[in-house]
Amino acid sequence: MSETASWQPSASIPNLLKRAAIMAEIRRFFADRGVLEVETPCMSQATVTDIHLVPFETRFVGPGHSQGMNLWLMTSPEYHMKRLLVAGCGPVFQLCRSFRNEEMGRYHNPEFTMLEWYRPHYDMYRLMNEVDDLLQQVLDCPAAESLSYQQAFLRYLEIDPLSADKTQLREVAAKLDLSNVADTEEDRDTLLQLLFTFGVEPNIGKEKPTFVYHFPASQASLAQISTEDHRVAERFEVYYKGIELANGFHELTDAREQQQRFEQDNRKRAARGLPQHPIDQNLIEALKVGMPDCSGVALGVDRLVMLALGAETLAEVIAFSVDRA
């Protein structure tokens, strides 16, 4: 394909036909299991507080809003879907566009397709099994293996991530030639993420999908803390052939705790010189009413299609990557 022919799609038509078949297969998977498909807004007056996510911001100008109203493109449909759970919708899934103002590259596009679903009365392990079922059905891959975050660090880096201090983490980073970044980093979780990215991820999910679960409690995000070990959160991620595919939680249902976590995120943002983000008070109010105990997961569909088709880049499986949009 000519580099100057920017009008052309980034994906071939055969790839788009295969992608459509995979989307239909995903919908059949959930229809067969009685999971309701829903659609929620792509824009909201609130957004994520996570220091590692950069949302797009826009302004609405219309009747009653002559001065404009700030809106954010959704990085995930999570908050709206949880409000539906509180309203009594039962198990739900969504295939939707999500937006993150981050890098563009082999595995990234600022606009992408997300598959997200929630299962009331499922614990983390039962949802992991369902994710495994979906991957086997779509990718025709072997059944997944699982190991804890702690086991992964001990196996590949010979360090315990739950007890190591920052000095010990920097020593391991030096062995990975990461001292130029690690030596000036004061946030322990950022150091852990650095080691996970460069020391663990390249070693897992080579032959079969790999679940990594029980991330440190300090990285809980919207997940519950384990009742068996308060050092870890009921959170998992899935990796296959060098690609992070999904991130799942045994969902936090405590409104007060969720408010505190959002506020803590904003304090971290301020400390790093990042803008603080508006907290989604509609979600907090919904949690006060009571969300059923549930587990949920977000899966990158474009990456899933990449794996299914054996493509090398995301651009090969989406109609128009951002440089051709």
From Swiss-Prot:
Top-level taxon of the source organism: Bacteria
Outcome (variant: residue 103 to A): Loss of lysylation activity
Binding site for ATP: 100-102, 109, 244-245, 300
Pfam families reported for this sequence: tRNA-synt_2
EC number annotated for this UniProt entry: 6.3.2.-
Record bears the keyword Ligase: yes
Protein's GO biological process: cellular response to acidic pH; lysyl-tRNA aminoacylation
Subunit-structure text: Homodimer.
Job description of the protein: With EpmB is involved in the beta-lysylation step of the post-translational modification of translation elongation factor P (EF-P) on 'Lys-34'. Catalyzes the ATP-dependent activation of (R)-beta-lysine produced by EpmB, forming a lysyl-adenylate, from which the beta-lysyl moiety is then transferred to the epsilon-amino group of EF-P 'Lys-34'. The substrate (R)-beta-lysine is 100-fold more efficient than either (S)-beta-lysine or L-alpha-lysine. Cannot ligate lysine to any tRNA.
Annotated protein name in UniProt: Elongation factor P--(R)-beta-lysine ligase
Source organism of this protein record: Escherichia coli (strain K12)
Gene transcribed to yield this protein: epmA
